[in-house]
């Protein structure tokens, strides 16, 4: 179980990324030490579990950028992902308030439950957005050998953007994470070795993305390019 990575993921998606010691630069630094593991691909990777604070200590009230970046990373990084129940509906819990709050029942499924999050009408708009996002990623990942078995190559963050590739044979995906609260125009020249075509399908938007000299990313954006 990759507890060090879990610890990092609990806060790096909130920080402004630089090239050395903040935000996603800490992810880069940590994964660069994978040589200490006999087989890092067999590590269990997770955002939280029944013994840790949940990824959200309190339920978010606005955008889900932090959630979307973290979940996309969890499901594309090396290792075997584990998702704790309730993450799909943004269940929150702070270990400082006791372990019981980390293990609250999933809402619904029992007579007398006022809320039933097992059905779409039992989820609020933010929960629906989170559920739909996770569902799309999981359906894509199921049976995807590139993500499950592929090599992991990453680049030191540049201009606040962390880029990594998963590759298996002649198939690959490239993930781009903007670890800042600013829009970025990313120079693609340093990444040409992992960008084998002039365009790629971007999973989350469903759009075809041109890969010319640069690529625009919104604040806290995440892209998953398929080749």
Go through each PLM region and give its residues:
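Short hydrophobic beta-strand that contains or immediately precedes a catalytic carboxylate
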Residues: 176
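Beta-strand-rich binding/interaction modules
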Residues: 183-205
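Short clusters of hydrophobic/aromatic residues that line enzyme substrate/ligand-binding pockets
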Residues: 1, 55, 106-108, 147, ...
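Aromatic- and acidic-residue-enriched segments that line the glycan-binding/catalytic groove
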Residues: 95-107
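Glycan-recognition and catalytic regions of carbohydrate-active enzymes
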Residues: 27-32, 85, 92-97, 112-173, ...
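Conserved alpha/beta catalytic core and glycan-binding cleft of carbohydrate-active enzymes
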Residues: 1-97, 179
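C-terminal beta-strand-rich structural cap/linker in extracellular carbohydrate-active enzymes
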Residues: 211-227
